[in-house]
């Protein structure tokens, strides 16, 4: 019910850097309580495994809008909302790698 995921890319700089790790929970209780500002991991059908911040939720339409920190981030501004079905889990712990 937990998964360790390595951060790849720059979508949540400076908080989450390439090479860091995040512990993701797949426990349904936590997934039902996702809210704006949470960090989630999802498996996008085109872009693959992604980590983003929740910008907006519309549960009755099965929509989660996600956003990255930099303006150039590929996120819901590019591909629209994601479905709850592609959600891998919610980040519950961030492991920063010393630089």
List each language-model region with its residue ranges.
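Extended hydrophobic leader/signal-anchor segments used for secretion and membrane insertion
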Residues: 1-99
């Amino acid at each position: 019910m937990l998964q360790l995921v390595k951060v790849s890319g720059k979508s949540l700089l400076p908080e989450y850097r390439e090479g860091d790790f995040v512990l993701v929970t797949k426990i349904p209780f936590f997934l039902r309580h996702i809210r704006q500002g949470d960090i989630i991991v999802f498996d996008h059908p085109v872009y693959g495994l992604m980590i983003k911040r929740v910008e907006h939720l519309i549960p009755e339409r099965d929509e989660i809008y996600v956003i990255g920190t930099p303006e150039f981030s590929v996120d819901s501004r590019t591909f629209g909302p994601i479905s709850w079905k592609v959600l891998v889990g919610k980040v519950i712990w961030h492991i920063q790698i010393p630089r």
